[in-house]
Amino acid sequence: MIKTNIAPRAYALKRPLKTMTPMTAASRPKLWRNDITGLRALAVLPVLIFHAFPSLIPGGFFGVDVFFVISGYLISGIIFRGIASSSFSYLEFYEKRIKRIIPNLILLLTFVAAAGWFILLPDEYANLGMHIDASTLFIQNFQLLSEIGYFTEDALRKPLLHLWSLAIEEQFYIVFPLICTLIWRLSRSVKMIGIAAALIALGSLAACLSSSDRNFAFYFPLTRFWELGAGILLSYSETFIGFSTSRFSQNVRNGLSIAGILMIVLPMAFVTESAAHPGLITLIPVLGAVLIIAAEPDAFFNRTLLCWRPMTFVGLISYSLYLWHWPLLAYLFIAVPDATPSVLIAALALSFVIAALV
């Protein structure tokens, strides 16, 4: 980690902020929920299938939007709990993010660079170098914005195409803790209104740009932060406002769970890449993810599907699985343009093996 010589009186990394006590212990976001781990699987599996067999799940790309909601909910929960207990540290927060993200990413980039030497043409390999640099700096979304659309045929020759979403998440990790520090002394109601207003503004921006400048809307962080913000709003309302669906009947929570699953699965099954995305259609799976998380672990699909052991297993390796599956497929598309379904399935199976090992 980078050491600093800034005097403690000038700025303290663990300086206590004016805290807000959570409403009740029961209303705080749970530190670990198997159903959210299973929700990661529901997010990543359609992405994998869409990349290998796009006709099977034409809207599988919505899985990334579900990931954004999960990340917003979980990361903001960590920050909110830390600030509420006067124990939040920027250094500790970023250290944990680095330990979780960087080792696997470095291993992946090393593999991509080595394999690309044998598979790519010289000009393609030179371009790959720029993508590796951009991925290392977490600005791959901007690199792709200057080059290519996500759904174009040429995108199949970009082994690091998928890292646009990781870049947006890391940009969020950099910005959000600082925003929390700046606004924390405001009242609860003002913060709630501010979060909601930001969601509406950024969501409206995404909806407008998705029809006029699709690539900009797809890759630009401000047109994606509202999806993370949906998870943030739920986390904040649980932690500090006291919102919890536990006060509702079991049937209501079951209904929220079922509705959430349908709002995720149906767009994945029927919406195609020609839709204006991210836009109004994206609101459906985003709200679906919010409903599932809000429904709590004992809701119907949460306990039966998302807590199912195979789903939680996939959820636990979802980050590695997402990292590794696309470079394997991309190099396969380049080296074997007419790869059979069995070969594509083998590539996906290999990504599972690697994800389970790294």
Regions found by a protein language model. Give the residues of each.
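Membrane-interface helix/loop caps of multi-pass membrane proteins
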Residues: 20-358
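Short, Lys/Arg-rich, polar N-terminal cytosolic tail immediately upstream
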Residues: 2-32
